[in-house]
Each structure stands twice: as structure tokens, then as C-alpha cells.
Amino acid sequence: MSTLALLTLNLQLYAPDSAKYGPDRLGEDVVPQLRFLGQALRRGAGERMQDLFPEGHFFMHVLYGLAWVEVGLRQPPESALHLQALEEANWALERLDRDAARAPFSRDLDPPYGVFYIGWSNWLRGGLLLLQPEQSRPLAQVDRFQAECRALALAFDRSPTPFLPAYPGQAWPVDSVVAIATLRLHDTLFPPRFGTTTQRWLEAAQDRLDPAPGLLPPRVDSQTGEVLEGARGSSQSLVARFLVEVDPEWGRSQYALFRRQFVAPFLGAPGVREYPEHIT
């Protein structure tokens, strides 16, 4: 009996009710978890993450801010939780605009500080604009979002490859997917101006897939876009979230390939392989 009770408890922990989560629903554990993370960030969690990997400080703040954007999008405008989401996402974005967040990245890249820094931070900036009615959006925030979009578009237009560098001589396609998604977001919020750049990027990216799984590779040559590493589950998990924003049809087809080759539940628990099943 005790074994059965333990198994039941574990299944409940591993398999939350997915019906409570979705584009128009907010799981009851989301806000408490975010409040916990907000306290941790204010006590130096970002700095501790920086000790673990080069983008630790930046990534923890940007994902925290983006999670609050998702909360805000599920709340009635001007409700208490919507206003808290706006405040916390703004707080996170302000931290990304400081030297501590920019320190790992090179100003000499195109765009300055690289596609990872500009793409992710501008996606958060665009999320903040989404949370606010047009007449309430701070002009400085609008101007900065549009300026960063122009810088990204110019960098893509000048680049011999669809995958811009995040560091000198190093490029990860997922970062360019995020950056192109910000251009799509711009053309949703404002009069369209980046359609040609986005379409050119889609055509070039589709010519540079990892041929075996037919998916975007995790790492490429920054000068040619040549695949340096085969598709991996961690990278594809991020690609799946953003590619559908760029091209819904291609995004869904890439997601289907990803699920078929990388998603592998184990004993009822959701799981994602880092490599396809045939690779050990």
C-alpha cells in the first residue's frame, strides 16, 4: 500500500494537470514560483548563475521577465496581477541594460553586443509593449525597440549567413530565430517594414538545416552558416517556441519533427532527449 501511495505521489509531481496551462490559462503554481525567483534575483541569484555559465546573469533575468510577460498577457488589463507583471518585466529589462548583463558580449559585433544580447533583450522589450495599450506605451521604450529592430535587420541584410554571431566567431541559430521573431513582432505592433528581411532569412535558414533530422542545427560556422554540430534537444526546445512566431507553418512542421525525434516520456514523466534516439 505504501508503495502504491508513493507511486501515486510521484505521478502527481511528474504529471501536473496540463489543462491548467495554456495560452489563455495560468497554472496556480506559476505566480508563486515567479515571486520566489524574483526574491532570489534580488538576493544575487543572477550573479551566482553567472559563475556557472557565461550568459547566466543575462539569461536568468530575461527569462524571468518573459515569464511575467506571459502572466500579464493572461490577465485583464489594469488588474493587480497585470500591473505586477508589467512592473516585474520592466525591472528585469532594466537589469539587462546594465554593464553586468552586457559584460560577456563584444561591442564590436554586428549588431553591437551580438545577436544573443540584442535579440533576447528586444524580445522582452517587445513583450512589454504588448502588455500596454498603444497610447500608454512609453515613447523611449517604443523608440528603443524600433531602433534595435533596425539594427538587427541591417545586420541580417549584411550577413553572408542567416545566423548572426553571439560572440566573435561563434554563432548559434536559435539566437537568430529569436532576433527574427522580434522583427515579426515589430510588424505586428507597428506598420510592417521587415517583411523582406524576414523572408530572405527564412529561405536562407531552410537551406542550412541539419540534413539527418531536417532541423535547425545548434551551432554553425559564423562566416558560412555551415553546420558544425547536429541537432540537439536543448536547442530545439527553444527553437520550437520562437520559430512559430516567425513562420507558423514551418514552425509547426519543425516542431513535429522535433517531437518525433527528441520527445521521449519516461514512466509517465515528460522528457526530451539531448540527441536523437539513434545517437548515443
Residue ranges and their predicted role:
Residues T3-L63, A67-E70, E87-A101, A140, ...:
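Low-complexity, Ser/Thr/Pro/Gly-enriched N-terminal "stalk/linker" regions
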Residues F53-V62, L66-V177:
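Extended ligand-binding groove/face enriched in aromatic
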